[in-house]
């Protein structure tokens, strides 16, 4: 999907068959409607399926109902195929295994950039960082990556969402899975032909087995619900609700999320799936909070040159506009801030 960037508040034009919309749609973003518990949708979603590639296991949910219509409000969400998507964002533990497989003796700037120093730094949002790196990165003294645990979370510490992730790091993780998730698995070919690239806009290859979801795939997994009352089968928020989620500490209720600085200082990076009752129709968690998530949308600059990639969802740091279906964002694919993460899509399981 290629989108054209416009001045703030202006229209974003989209391909034929996708409706234009104006952003931000503040009136829609603040609408209050049917809450989950009042709509008969209360409870958890479908159980995830665990898929393991070598030693890396990812829990996914199937997104069915292919050929669904787009959202009447935004024109987003129509998908003509079935697929699976991560029930959760990629975690510290999963990313740690990736680093120790492919980035111990990095041979290119692209591989070295899979880890960035903020991952180990103390900050206002995390007590002591997430992943530490030691060593020199040479054959004689390879890098070793270790989790910096949050003792209070116990075994759930490694399930915290991994952050400071660029689009390129997410794409290399997808390639690694595609190629077997071993130390010998390439990060440069597979779902995406990267060949050392650290800039530019790169399309997904046909036949990908794991990939960064398209804007419509991500959107459908978050908001679509064929059982929703009324004509438009899309909720406004990824918690099966048309009411703004409550930003509060986990586990919360049926319409809660980690966004808008809801968690205490040093404890803002929560385990994925910690809001156990706040779930989409298909069974995804945390699309309303924890981290912004990369998608595969491509945005053009004012001269029509593709420059940026899409992000969606709420984050631990941001407020209500980004939580709703009316709040897409885009950044350069090198962007790797403290509230950017990702989940992957795959073939139906």
Regions found by a protein language model. Give the residues of each.
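Cytochrome P450 core scaffold surrounding the K-helix E-X-X-R motif
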Residues: 71, 295-305
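Disulfide-stabilized, aromatic/cysteine-rich ligand-recognition loop
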Residues: 277-280, 304-349
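Short, polar loop/linker segments at the starts of domains and inter-domain junctions
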Residues: 69-84, 248-260, 321-335
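Short, well-ordered junction/capping motifs at the entry into regular secondary structure
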Residues: 199-205, 209, 250-288, 332
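Active-site microenvironments of metalloenzymes and redox enzymes
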Residues: 77, 84-215, 221-248, 300
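GGW-centered surface loops in extracellular recognition modules
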Residues: 48-73, 81, 199-203, 207-212
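N-terminal secretory signal peptides that target proteins for export/translocation
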Residues: 1-20
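Bacterial Sec-dependent N-terminal signal peptides
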Residues: 2-3, 32-59
């Amino acid at each position: 999907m290629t989108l054209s960037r416009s001045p703030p508040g202006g229209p974003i034009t989209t391909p034929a068959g996708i409706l234009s919309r104006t952003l931000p749609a503040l009136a829609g973003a603040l609408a209050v409607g049917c809450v989950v518990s009042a709509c008969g949708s209360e409870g958890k979603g479908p159980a995830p399926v665990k898929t393991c590639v070598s030693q890396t296991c990812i829990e996914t949910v199937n997104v069915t109902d292919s050929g669904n219509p787009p959202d009447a409000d935004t024109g987003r969400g129509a998908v003509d195929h079935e697929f699976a998507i991560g029930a959760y964002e990629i975690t510290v533990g999963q990313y740690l295994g990736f680093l120790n497989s492919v980035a111990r003796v990095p041979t290119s700037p692209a591989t070295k950039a899979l880890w960035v120093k903020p991952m180990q730094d103390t900050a206002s949002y995390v007590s002591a960082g997430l992943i530490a790196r030691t060593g020199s990165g040479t054959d004689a003294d390879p890098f070793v990556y270790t989790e910096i645990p949050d003792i209070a979370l116990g075994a759930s510490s490694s399930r915290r969402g991994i952050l400071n992730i660029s689009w390129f790091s997410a794409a290399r993780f997808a390639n690694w899975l595609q190629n077997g998730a071993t130390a010998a698995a390439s990060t440069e070919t597979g779902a995406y032909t990267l060949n050392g690239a650290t800039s530019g806009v790169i399309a997904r290859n046909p036949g990908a087995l794991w990939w960064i979801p398209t804007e419509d795939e991500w959107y459908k997994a978050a908001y679509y619900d064929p059982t929703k009352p009324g004509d438009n089968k899309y909720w406004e928020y990824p918690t099966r609700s048309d009411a703004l989620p409550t930003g509060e500490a986990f586990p919360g209720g049926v319409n809660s999320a980690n966004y808008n600085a809801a968690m205490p200082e040093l404890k803002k990076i929560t385990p994925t799936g910690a809001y156990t009752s706040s779930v989409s129709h298909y069974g995804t968690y945390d699309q309303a909070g924890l981290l912004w998530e990369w998608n595969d949308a491509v945005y053009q600059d004012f001269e029509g040159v593709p420059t940026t990639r899409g992000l969606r969802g709420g984050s631990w740091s941001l407020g209500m506009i980004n939580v709703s279906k009316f709040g897409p964002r885009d950044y350069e694919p090198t962007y790797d801030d403290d509230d950017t993460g990702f989940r992957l899509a795959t073939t139906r399981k």
